[in-house]
Every structure is written in C-alpha cells, then in structure tokens.
Amino acid sequence: MSQAPVLSTEPEFETVAPLVRETPSNDYLNKYYCLPQLTEYLNSHEYKSIALQFPANDVADSALVVRLLKQTVDPSISLFILADTNYSPCCVDVVGANHIKADLVVHFGSACLNPVTMPVVYVFCNPEIDVKVMVDQLTEQIKDAEQPNILLDSDSKYYPEMPTMFKALREAFPDKIIVRSFIPNPQETLGLSEEETKPDAEEGYLYRRTHDDLDPQETMLIYVGTPSSSLALHYSTRFGATAYFNPVSGQAETPKTAIMKRYRYMNMARAAQTIGILINSLSMSETKEMSKKLQKAIAESGKKSYTFVVGKPNVAKLANFEVVDVWAVFGCGIGGIILENEEQYFKPVVSVYELGLALQPELSWTGEWEIDSNKVDLNVEVDEDEVDEPFFNPVTGKFIDHKPLHVQEYSDDEETQALVKSIGGSLTIKNTVTTAAIQLQQREWQGLGHDYGSGEEDGADLEEGRGGIARGYAVGDDERM
C-alpha cells in the first residue's frame, strides 16, 4: 500500500515562543518609578483623578505600579492608566486625560517637556547607564574632533545620571570646555536631586536645547540615548560635530540623516496648490495659535489649505484626502514630525519650518533644519505684480504658469457678474481660480458628470428597455436560455 500524500503545507511564519517576563520586585518598582516621591507629591496636593501615562516599554509594569500606589496614596484618589497615547509618547496625552476628566497627568519615561494645557508631573525613572563604557566608546570621536567645546545632552529619562556623566567627561578630557543641559522646570519633575536641576554658570550648565551661549560650529554635541529622526537631523545641521551613545546597546551610534531629501520636499511644497495642515499634537499650548498662523501664511502665498486632526497619522488615514498635494505637520519637535517611513506616504510630508521656507517669494536655504516652531518665519510678503509670473519647479523640471489662487483679470462686465465661470479651462469663483477645479480636471475619473465644460459629449437618449421574465431572450443569431 502506497503512502498517503502529505496535504499540509509549511507555515508561512515561524512559530515564536512566547516571551516570559520575570515579575519585577517591589523594591525595583519603587526605585525605578520613584513611587515614594510620587506618593508624597500626590498626598500633599488636592488632585483626585490621576492619569498615569506609561511608554510602550513600561506598560507591562503599569498594573503593578497602580497596585503599589493604591497602598500608599489617599483612598479618595482615583488612578487611571493611559496605555496607548493619542500622539507622540514623549508628549503629555491631554486628549486621553480629558476623556477620564483627570486633574493631573503623571508622565513616565522620556518627555519633550513642551508647555502643556493641564497640570503634569514628569517621572524620568532611573534607567541604569555604565558611564565608564560611555566614555570609552566616545573617546576616539572626542579626540578627533576639532571643536574646543563639548555640549552634553541626553534623553530626559537619563537626566538623573547627568551629573555623573558630566563629571566623568570633564575628568577624561580636561582640555575641552564641557557644558551640559539641565531641566528648566524642576518643580514638575520627580527623582532629580538639586544638583541635577540647579543651573550654575561657573559649571557651565545650560538650559535644555537652548544653546545660544555657545558657537554651534565650534561645539561638538554628545547625546546620550536614541534621538528621534527630527532631533538628529536638527543637531547634525546645527553643531560642528555630533556623537551619540546608546546606553541600551552600549555602543556609539551615528543616526542617518537625509538633509537633501528635505530640500526636495521643500521644493515640492513650494509648487503645491493645496496644503494639508496636519495637527499632530493637541497638548501643546500654542497649537491653536500656530494653526491660525499657518492658515494665514498659506492664504497670503496664494495657496489653498485644509486643517486635519486624525489622531496618530498613518499612511491609510492620509491617503483618503486626494486633493492634498503636500502635508505640513505641526507637532512636537522631537516626536511629532513625521520623518520615519515617510516614503510610504502617497503625498510628501514637510515640517512647519520647511513650509515656512517654501512659502517665501524667494527661496533661501541656509542648510539648517529647525524643530522649534517659534523660530519659523511665517510672514509672507507677496508682490502682486509677480503673481502671474511662471516659476520653475526643480522637482518636475517644468514651469508652473501661475499661482494656484491667483485672481483672473478680464474686462467683460457681464462675465464679471457671474459667480462661477470657466476661463481658459480653469474654473473660477468670483474671478479666483480654484484648486478644487484644477484637481478635478486632472483626475481620470471625474464622476458621472457635472454642469461645467462645453467639451463634454451629449448623453445617450433614453429608450424603453426590454420587459417581462428574463429567460428565452436572443442576442444576435444565438438563442440564450
């Protein structure tokens, strides 16, 4: 008897064993999440509804943290876990906190420290870092650097170790002028000593990411942690040299940056007709003000804009809006600017800084890349005499004949009274060319028909069709049953 054939197939994906995680001890949780200090803070204030925001890597500890806190805080205090943030994890999730009507947000892990619209306490935790390994990994790069100054900065979660790292670098490189950043709002942070938060001009302490006291091109930046793509790009264009140390891997790393790609996207925004303003943060205090500034600047430059709030942006969400030519993202400068996997989006995504450059009448690219929206120039001055002048698009290699929302000038009094009129193939509303009409004309599928355009073919005449039961009908010489 022959053997039966094997009908099963190999699985498409390999089976992965479940990750078994050892439950951390109470001592570890108390130290890592600064629970004694947090308990003292909560009991000394009148907050009754507390939202605990955890980063993705620490969500597994959230239930254990809540259990320990309930044993020590006032029984009238309600604790809620925010496990999935609406926007960047470094930002305070104001939207989620408002859903539960929280009085206070406790933000664990790395934070961007942007001003927010509600009370917040930052807990940077206490991740371990081997300072000796850090110095050894960075020694070669520091010795090869020509810059006399060194600025030490890090992810905010490593700020408890900042004094130790600072002293180690000073001892290892006495010939260098070494300065470091510090936390600007110590009253909102837990787990930091006075030494870690107090500025001292003699010691060279500086405010976080406010380095106006240094000549950037004469300074080497040392960053401890894993910077976001936007922060790495900003640092690479601002300082004379950069070096990064990842405490998790224990290795010095060099993040990839693509400044020329940003220049290309900026030119695409310059030639765009319709710009989508994508709000990628609702927690920042200047969100409304910046949104109005962007709308005004885009309108003054002769372009059309739409404002969108879609939660966490992804390819599928933004693909629904075909009329948008370029997306301008306003959000946290560290985690709210879309640079990761941007090639997957159907339309280019630019930052507010890039949009500000694109809207100017004359292109001026200094090579710097700014993440602070307050430093973006959105004052657009357009010469009315140059509105109809064509300009060259270096991306497509073509000339664009006019600004998208320019005003058509024509002298027929009867035609000027019309609300809607087709001029030279472009639809105008009150003498203004509309981007919606241009978008419709460029589409292969324009719907079932519209009232404009004399070149349309006449529709077929309506005739009475066949009637009766659908059987025994004939098509040509063939009989179909």
From Swiss-Prot:
It comes from the Eukaryota. One of its GO terms (cellular component) is cytoplasm. Residues 449-481 are annotated as: Disordered. Keywords: Cytoplasm, Iron, Iron-sulfur, Metal-binding. Pathway: Protein modification; peptidyl-diphthamide biosynthesis. [4Fe-4S] cluster binds at residues 91, 112, 332. Its cofactor is [4Fe-4S] cluster. It is found in: Cytoplasm. Binds 1 [4Fe-4S] cluster per subunit. The cluster facilitates the reduction of the catalytic iron-sulfur cluster in the DPH1 subunit. GO terms for molecular function: 2-(3-amino-3-carboxypropyl)histidine synthase activity; 4 iron, 4 sulfur cluster binding; metal ion binding. One of its GO terms (biological process) is protein histidyl modification to diphthamide. NCBIfam families: diphth2_R, DPH2. Required for the first step of diphthamide biosynthesis, a post-translational modification of histidine which occurs in elongation factor 2. DPH1 and DPH2 transfer a 3-amino-3-carboxypropyl (ACP) group from S-adenosyl-L-methionine (SAM) to a histidine residue, the reaction is assisted by a reduction system comprising DPH3 and a NADH-dependent reductase, predominantly CBR1. Facilitates the reduction of the catalytic iron-sulfur cluster found in the DPH1 subunit. Component of the 2-(3-amino-3-carboxypropyl)histidine synthase complex composed of DPH1, DPH2, DPH3 and a NADH-dependent reductase, predominantly CBR1. Belongs to the DPH1/DPH2 family. DPH2 subfamily. This is 2-(3-amino-3-carboxypropyl)histidine synthase subunit 2. The lineage of its organism: Eukaryota, Fungi, Dikarya, Ascomycota, Saccharomycotina. The gene is DPH2.
